Amino acid sequence: MAFDKLGRFFGISNDDELANDEEYTTQNEENNEDLPLNSINRDNVVSIKSGLNSSKSKIVLYEPRVYSDAKDVAQNLLNNKAVVINFSRMEDSSARRIVDFITGTVYTLNGEIQRIGDKIFLATPPKFVTDGKISDLVDKKDNLS
């Protein structure tokens, strides 16, 4: 009751407060009508479990012995797996043919192929990033390129 008298003294009454509350709620309702219910950007939220269960990057090791093994190497690249290829058990002419085939596959996928050792190559699909060079460690003799 004392607050009512004080409110009237300052020109505020309970009726005015109710009117202000009604105006406030109608303004909020109008603003909420503009936004769809699914307007929250869910791309910014990442589940911790999804990061743990996501597919892991894989590296496959191959020692081809015949030219037809190149198809298996290419299939792994198409499945977004990096491939380390050791040609030490092949003739140089067959190894060159496989390197040419894999180079074409890697080019088509926008990946990379690098020589990482004597008769050893690394072929990666586009989602892999390789840093650094070990060309100083590779012998200067060029058997396959």
Curated annotation (Swiss-Prot):
One protein family per Pfam: SepF
GO-annotated cellular components: cytoplasm
A GO BP annotation: division septum assembly
Gene3D superfamilies: SepF-like protein
Protein name: Cell division protein SepF
Protein's job: Cell division protein that is part of the divisome complex and is recruited early to the Z-ring. Probably stimulates Z-ring formation, perhaps through the cross-linking of FtsZ protofilaments. Its function overlaps with FtsA.
InterPro entries named in the record: Cell_div_SepF, Cell_div_SepF/SepF-rel, SepF-like_sf
Cellular localization per UniProt: Cytoplasm
Keyword Cytoplasm belongs to the record: yes
UniProt keyword annotation of Nucleus present: no
Family recorded in the similarity comment: Belongs to the SepF family.
Main location: cytoplasm
Keywords: Cell cycle, Cell division, Cytoplasm, Septation
UniProt cross-references to PANTHER family, sorted A to Z: CELL DIVISION PROTEIN SEPF (PTHR35798:SF1)
Highest taxon of source: Bacteria
Assembly, per entry: Homodimer. Interacts with FtsZ.
